[in-house]
Every structure is written in C-alpha cells, then in structure tokens.
Regions:
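A short, Trp-centered hydrophobic/proline-enriched beta-strand micro-motif
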Residues: 116-125, 167
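Short Gly/Pro-enriched turn/cap motifs at secondary-structure boundaries
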Residues: 127-130, 154-157, 173-174, 200-207
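Flexible, small-/acidic-enriched active-site or ligand-binding loops
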Residues: 134-136, 188-219
Length: 381
C-alpha cells in the first residue's frame, strides 16, 4: 500500500476544493450541450497549477510527479466525470514537448500551454492504422525543412489548439529503419483543415476533429526530438498517457460508486431503504472491492513511473484495470438507480458514457490485452 505524503494529500484537497467551487450539474449539462468547456474554468485551473502538474516548474508546470497528476485526475473526475476529464485534458500533449523537446522548444511552447493561454492538440490517430503503427502521413524533407501531408482523426482540443503534435513518416537515415518523426505544427499554418467529426457518446467537452495537413510547410526547428525516433517517442508517450488516463478512470469509478451509495441510502422500496437489502450490499461490496483494487494498481504504476521503473505492461495493466472498473461501476450504478439511472436528470448515465469513451482512448481493451499478453508470454520460437 502506498502511503501518501502530506504534499500529495494537499493536492487532493486542492483539487476537491476547486471542483466543489467550479463544478456543478448545470455547468456540466450546458457544457456538454454546446460541446465546449468554460474557458474561464480552464484559466482558473491553470492558475492553481493543475495543468501539467507533473511537468517542470521552469516551464510553468507543477514540478511534481505522475502520482500527483493521478491523484489530481482521480479527485476531479470523481466529483464530476465530464468536467474533471476536460480539466485533465487541458494540457494533454505538453508532456511530449517536455520529454522530447529541445531547450528552445520547451521555453517557447510549454509556458503558454501550462499557463492556460493556449492548448496543444495531439494528432496521432489515422484511419485503418493501429495506434502504434507507422503513420501513413508523410513529412518530406527539402532545403527549407519539411512538407507535411496526411489526415488524422479523433483529435481532441483541435478547435482551441495553438499547436498540433503529429507523427509522420520520414525517410530513413543511414542508421534508421522504418523511420517516423514527431513534429510541432502551428495551428494557423497554411494547408491545415479542421473538421468536426460530430457528437460522441462521451468526451464531448474536448471535442473530436479530423485534421488534414495539405502541403504544410514546417521549418527545421519544428522537428520534435531526433529524426526517425517518432515510434519510440510514441511508445514512451503511451506509457505515460495510459497511467494518466487510468487516474481519470479511477475517478470515474469512484464517482459512480459514490452516487450509487448515496442513492441506495435514500431510496425506499417495500418500506425499506434498498441499501438494507443483502443483494444491494453485495453489489456495493463488489464495486468497492473492484475500485480499491484498481486504485492500488494505478497508484503503483504511477509511483513506478516516477521511480523510472514503469514499462508498457505496467501502464497497460493500470489503464485496463481502471477503465473496466469505471465501466462496471457506472453500469451497476445505473442498475441500482432503476429506471432513473437512464435519465439525464441523474449523473450516473453520464459517468457511464464518459467511462466508455475513456476505455477506447490511447488503446482500447483489446490493444491493452495484446500488450500485456505479449509481455507475459514472451517471444515465441
């Protein structure tokens, strides 16, 4: 069992106080209706250091670890699944610049993102390609830098982004095979087209867009990291990303459980509170055990990452465990609410939608099981 430090408990308290002051049901409903998170709430979250809490203070980050980022995500998402996720996603992508960028890139791009003045949108997913596959998009080198072409899908924060991060195939050098590279692209560059991909079951506060790059000119300083290292960078990105998402999923699971408990404590059936029935207690017990098991798994993964001991398997297990716990908790919460659980008036249906959307992000359950299974079985002769 990981014993949280005083500073880590303070992160939880700060997140709880913020959410209680900023999150409410009507704000969440209105934001989801229009598909846009209130910009002023982003600003206040950034002012408290919630955007990029695990990134260096030198670039306006929080200077803490991934475990603190997980605690923040869990707390925010437990209090409101939709609004909490939107705050957590405000700085998504900044970690790539912090991990792989040059000193100049970090100084130029990170402070505006982490201070809430702009956003970065991660454009990695392509139609017909596995999430870890070499990209079909290309970046052709010339004497002025690169020419970027390709189409990306399911890009969150695209509408409010100041920059995109993307992955494109680049020619292999003398020591590179199957090379791909990561790039920083100005959102207002000529040749970029952003198209809304429509409403989704969940995750609507961060949007979802198709982004097309058509002969987009990139100067040499827009290469993120070394040429040909894009797939290795992608693997490192997914390891951190999955643990962060596991923190969000853990919050969704806890939030759904708390709402189920609150309902069974007050709902009367056959002249008794339904929380008094053994079948209800058993359902709640099973959920509580599953959520606590997920919590231990996620905290351990985050602590391992901070200690430099995490790997793809650790991250995949954390996200798989937490995401499936979130879906199970939200599903059972709906069942315990009866017909009311399906109504928009109650929050549990929204937790289910957000949990389902999150389970498909940065690796669906099948992708994660592939990672874990391959690691456990090892290479076959």
């Amino acid at each position: 069992m990981i014993q949280l430090t005083r500073a880590q408990k303070q992160v939880q308290k700060a997140a709880r106080d913020f959410a209680k002051g900023e999150f409410d049901r009507e704000t969440a409903r209105e934001a989801e209706k229009i598909g846009q998170f209130p910009e002023e709430v982003f600003q206040r979250a950034a002012a408290l250091g919630f955007v990029g809490i695990q990134l260096p203070e030198a670039y306006s980050g929080g200077g803490m670890g991934l475990l603190e980022a997980v605690l923040l995500a869990e707390t925010l998402c437990a209090l409101d699944g939709s609004l909490g996720q939107a705050v957590c996603e405000a700085g998504h992508g900044a970690e790539c610049i912090a991990r792989f960028g040059s000193q100049d890139q970090k100084e130029r791009f990170l402070p505006p993102i982490l201070e809430g003045r702009t956003a970065v949108a991660v454009a990695f997913v392509e139609a017909g390609r596995g999430i870890s596959s070499a990209p079909a998009a290309t970046a052709a080198p010339d004497d002025k830098g690169w020419l970027l072409n390709g189409t990306k899908h399911f890009v969150s924060n695209a509408e409010r982004a100041g920059i995109f991060l993307t992955l494109a195939a680049t020619p292999a050098g003398a020591d590179e095979t199957g090379a791909a590279s990561m790039f920083i692209v100005d959102a207002d560059a000529a040749g970029i087209r952003v198209t809304d991909e429509g409403r989704r079951l969940g995750g609507n506060l961060t949007g979802g867009a198709e982004v097309t790059f058509d002969e987009v000119r990139l100067t040499p300083d827009r290469l993120l990291g070394k040429p040909g290292r894009g797939l290795a960078q992608l693997e490192a990105y997914y390891m951190e990303r999955r643990i962060l998402l596991a923190g969000q999923a853990l919050g969704l699971a806890q939030g759904a459980l708390e709402r189920a408990v609150a309902y069974v404590r007050q709902r009367v059936q056959f002249s008794r509170k339904i929380g008094a029935f053994a079948v209800t207690r058993h359902k709640i017990a099973d959920l509580a055990a599953r959520v606590e098991a997920a919590r231990l798994t996620v905290y351990q993964a985050a602590a391992a990452f901070d200690a430099g001991q995490a790997d793809a398997r650790t991250a995949a297990i954390a996200k798989l465990t937490a995401a499936e716990a979130a879906i199970a908790a939200a599903d059972e919460a709906i069942q315990l609410h009866g017909g009311y659980g399906y109504m928009r008036e109650y929050d549990v249906e929204r937790y289910y939608r957000e949990a389902k959307a999150l389970s498909l992000t940065a690796g669906a359950p099948g992708d994660l099981r592939d990672v874990v299974g391959a690691s456990v079985i090892g290479k076959l002769k």
